[in-house]
Amino acid sequence: MQGTPAKKHTHGWQASLALQFCHTPEKTVLHSARHVGPLTVQRPFYPEEETCHLYLLHPPGGIVGGDELNISVQLDPNSHALITMPGAGKFYRSSGPLARLNQHFFLEENATLEWLPQDTIFFPGANAVLQSVFHLHHSSRLLAWELFCLGRPVINETFSHGTIESRLEVWLDDEPLLIERQHLADGDLTTVANHPWIGTLLCYPASDALLEGVREKLVTLDNFAGATLTDGLLSIRFLSHDNLICQRAMREIWQCLRPHVIAKTPHPPRIWQT
């Protein structure tokens, strides 16, 4: 891995990570990993032969006001990577400066990405701007999720102040499939029905049969989960007061979708069990 140290300026970390995966006759390999500052990855491993499993490491102290993190992931033709993290991401309270996280993913022909990060926790007073953009080829495959925690509900702490600006985009052959923006500020959580846990799971390509199968699995979550299918993109939403309910539902649906979308049996990362 090529790394460049970054200085911690008074306005925060300026960190970046650029990953490129390529396919070989034996397996997908991490062809290059360039990082600046406290963004890095562990050594890839292969619990299911050719698929590359990779753990991405965020700054150990979390993300604070003034930090800007940029992540770029490139999957060359026929490559397959599953990326997760050993722990939750954290946005801490800020006295004013924004904390930014920009994530861009580029999938070429027949490439497969499973982007399965753990929770992102927003402490009260955080001022966070997040952007996740997926660029797909029509023959590529995507299973991706994000799970936000507003405050620390386990200790009855709410996201009583601060701002969160999040943007989620999916592009297919340079045409937009999904462009979604969410704004939360000043403790007003009415747009999420005052739920502290917000989950989104994306699947491409998907069919009407997959949509109906997912909806059947969401029945037990009452009105706080739903699924839609638009031009082959399956979008599944979750709201919850309980992180275990939300996490379990997302993981169960991922396990259900994986054999249909990428023709592989589920192989949950070991780090999820710790």
Swiss-Prot record:
MF-aspect GO terms: nickel cation binding
GO CC annotation: cytoplasm
Family, per entry: Belongs to the UreD family.
Keyword Chaperone set for record: yes
Keyword Chaperone: yes
Function of the molecule: Required for maturation of urease via the functional incorporation of the urease nickel metallocenter.
Signal peptide start and end residues: none
Localization in the cell: Cytoplasm
Gene: ureD
Species whose genome carries this gene: Enterobacter sp. (strain 638)
The name this protein goes by in its record: Urease accessory protein UreD
Quaternary assembly: UreD, UreF and UreG form a complex that acts as a GTP-hydrolysis-dependent molecular chaperone, activating the urease apoprotein by helping to assemble the nickel containing metallocenter of UreC. The UreE protein probably delivers the nickel.
Sorted UniProt keywords: Chaperone, Cytoplasm, Nickel insertion
Organism superkingdom: Bacteria
Broad class of where this protein is predominantly found: cytoplasm
InterPro entries hit by this protein: UreD
